[in-house]
Amino acid sequence: MASSYRINCSTLLHLLMFLSSLLTSSANLSFNFYASSCSVAEFLVRNTVRSATSSDPTIPGKLLRLFFHDCFVQGCDASVLIQGNSTEKSDPGNASLGGFSVIDTAKNAIENLCPATVSCADIVALAARDAVEAAGGPVVEIPTGRRDGKESMAANVRPNIIDTDFTLDQMIDAFSSKGLSIQDLVVLSGAHTIGASHCNAFNGRFQRDSKGNFEVIDASLDNSYAETLMNKCSSSESSSLTVSNDPETSAVFDNQYYRNLETHKGLFQTDSALMEDNRTRTMVEELASDEESFFQRWSESFVKLSMVGVRVGEDGEIRRSCSSVN
C-alpha cells in the first residue's frame, strides 16, 4: 500500500476551521466523543480495518460503498446493516454491498471492552474513514456521537441511491437533497479510485448486435478501454464478474480516477458525465493535476457526508448487535 498522506500546516488550519463551522450545526457530535467512555474505540476500528485489508485488498472499496449507501438512504444511522425481509439490506439495490463482517468484527471487539457505548453508525463512518487511509489516502478526522436508527425500510433505497446511468442533473439533485454541493459530488465520486463493480452496473453502455456480440453505444468511452470491458463482460457468467473501477491503480486511493476521466476511461456513465459537462469538467481537471488538492477536498466533503441525516440523543439508540434493533 502507498503511504498515507499527511496534511501540511496551512491545509490543516483550513480544515479545522471548516470542521468547526460544521460542528456548530451539529452540537451533539464532537471529536473524540468516546474519549472518556471508550477511549480505544477508534483504535479498535482502525486496527480491524487494517487487518481485514491486509488479507483482502478489496475491503476499502467495500467499506466506502457501504457508507455511501447508508448515508444516502436514511442518513448515516447504520440502518443498512439491519437484517430482515423488508429492510434496506434486502433491497436488490444493496445486494452487492460488502464489508459487513468487518463492521461486525469491530463492533464485537468494542462491545467486549465498552458494552452498549459505541454506535454502529459511528463504526461504519470510522471504518469508511480508515478504509481510505488503509488504501493510501488522507487521514481524516471526523466527529462522532451518532446514534443508530431504529428502523430500516427497503422502500427507501431506490428513491435515494444513485444509479450508474444517472445524468449529471440527476446526480446534482440527489446530492443537493442531502445538503451536498456539486463540488462534493465531483470530489466524492473520487471514491471510484478504488473498488470494483459487476458488469451489469455499466453494460448499458453496450448493446449486442445481430450475432450476439457486444458493440459500443456510448461514444464517450475510449475505444481500447471499451474493448477491454466488452471482452471482460461478454461471457455467460458476466453477472458475477467484477471489473476494477480504476483500471490503473485499483487498490490505491489516489487521484488516478480523475486522470482516467480525462482519457475517457470512466467505468460508469455517471463518471464520464463529470468530464463531458462544463459545470464539472474544470474541477475534474484540477483534481487530476493536483493530488494534494483532491485529498484536502476529500477530507472536507467526506466529513460533510458523514453528517448527513445523523441521529443523536433520543432520536436513536446504541444497538447491541449491528444487524438488529434493540
From Swiss-Prot:
InterPro entries in UniProt: Haem_peroxidase, Haem_peroxidase_sf, Peroxidase_pln, Peroxidases_heam-ligand_BS, Secretory_peroxidase
Using the record for this protein, list the coiled-coil segments as residue ranges, or answer none.
Answer: none
What gene name is given for the protein in this entry? Answer: PER46
Per the record, where is site Transition state stabilizer?
Answer: 65
Q: Which residues bind Ca(2+) 1?
A: 70, 73, 75, 77, 79
What further fact does the record state? There are 73 peroxidase genes in A.thaliana.
Which family is this sequence assigned to?
Answer: Belongs to the peroxidase family. Classical plant (class III) peroxidase subfamily.
Q: Which organism is it from?
A: Arabidopsis thaliana (Mouse-ear cress)
Question: Signal peptide: which range, if any?
Answer: 1-27
Which reaction equations make up its catalytic activity? 2 a phenolic donor + H2O2 = 2 a phenolic radical donor + 2 H2O
Task: Write down how the cofactor binds this protein.
Answer: Binds 1 heme b (iron(II)-protoporphyrin IX) group per subunit.
Q: Which cysteines are joined by disulfide bonds?
A: 38-114, 71-76, 120-322, 199-233
Gene Ontology molecular function, alphabetical: heme binding; lactoperoxidase activity; metal ion binding
Location relative to the cell: Secreted
Q: What does this protein do?
A: Removal of H(2)O(2), oxidation of toxic reductants, biosynthesis and degradation of lignin, suberization, auxin catabolism, response to environmental stresses such as wounding, pathogen attack and oxidative stress. These functions might be dependent on each isozyme/isoform in each plant tissue.
Judged by the first EC level, this protein's enzyme class is: oxidoreductase
Q: Which is a Pfam family this sequence falls into?
A: peroxidase
Q: Would you tell me the protein name for this molecule? A: Peroxidase 46
Q: Cite the entry's keywords alphabetically.
A: Calcium, Disulfide bond, Glycoprotein, Heme, Hydrogen peroxide, Iron, Metal-binding, Oxidoreductase, Peroxidase, Secreted, Signal
Q: Which residues are glycosylated?
A: 28, 85, 278
The entry marks the following residues as binding Ca(2+) 2, namely 193, 246, 249, 254
Record EC number: 1.11.1.7
Which cellular component terms (GO) are annotated to the entry?
A: extracellular region
Cofactor annotation:
heme b; Ca(2+)
